[in-house]
Regions:
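A cross-family phosphate/adenosyl-ligand binding-site feature
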Residues: 14-23, 29, 43
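Short, structured coil segments at secondary-structure junctions
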Residues: 5-7, 30, 87, 141
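Active-site-adjacent helical/loop segments in soluble small-molecule enzymes
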Residues: 62, 131-188
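Glycine-rich phosphate/pyrophosphate-binding loop at beta-loop-alpha junctions
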Residues: 39-141, 186-214
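Single conserved hydrophobic/aromatic residue that forms the stacking wall/gate
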Residues: 1-6, 10-11
């Protein structure tokens, strides 16, 4: 659809190519400004508006926030909003177990990179380390990290499909997956989370959920 309106699509190999370097090269070649997907204050503020819309519509003081996390922009933007409204709201990032760089970084209070890159079902969250700007914000907000195994991610996708008629990709269901895997800290809590994205091939979705064609 993007190509139909004149856009040029750049295909990359997720296992070999560096998407940031590709973007920088295109921006340099075409004399354009590169807008980073998370490590940019304007982007972070924009991502925070999702939380702002929720708190403006729902008269609820959340105890916890568990937000899907790749580079940390959505978590940072959400955290800024929630902490300014509910000061004692505990913030968490949600990541797949093999890509829990934020969880590890918060423990160390310094940026930790994933070295053993085991690619899984949450391709949108497979960023090896937190952003410089986002990490400073999240650390200042006293954010902590949670992570989930694939079985909980798939369980979350099934719940969203069966109970809410929602088709959500693995990366988008990671917040609910972390709730399911960390029930002991989530009991009797009012929790803010975001279900983000349905970008998954139909055959792959059915395969993960065990849905037979036809």
């Amino acid at each position: 659809r993007s190509c139909l309106v004149g856009s040029e699509m750049c295909i990359r190999d997720r296992y070999k190519d560096d998407r940031e370097k590709i973007g920088l090269n295109i921006a340099k070649r075409e004399k354009r400004k590169l807008i980073k997907p998370f490590d940019d204050l304007h982007v972070i503020y924009g991502q925070g508006t999702a939380a702002l819309e929720v708190v403006n519509e729902i008269d609820t003081k959340f105890d916890m926030s568990i937000v899907c996390c790749s580079g940390g922009g959505l978590a940072a933007g959400t955290g800024i909003v929630l902490k300014n409204i509910v000061h004692n709201c505990q913030l968490y990032t949600a990541e797949p177990k093999n890509w829990n760089d934020h969880e590890k970084s918060f423990i160390q209070e310094d940026i930790v990179s994933i070295q053993d890159k085991k690619y899984g079902i949450c391709d949108a969250l497979e960023n090896p380390k937190p952003g410089e700007i986002t990490f400073k914000i999240n650390l200042a907000l006293e954010t902590k990290g949670l992570s989930a195994d694939d079985k909980y991610i798939i369980e979350a996708m099934k719940i969203l499909y069966d109970e809410f008629d929602l088709i959500v990709e693995p990366s988008g269901a990671i917040g609910l997956a972390c709730i399911l895997q960390n029930r002991e800290i989530c009991q009797n809590k009012k929790i803010f989370t975001i279900l983000s994205g349905g970008n998954i091939d139909a055959n792959r979705y059915n395969e993960l959920l065990g849905i037979e064609d036809g």
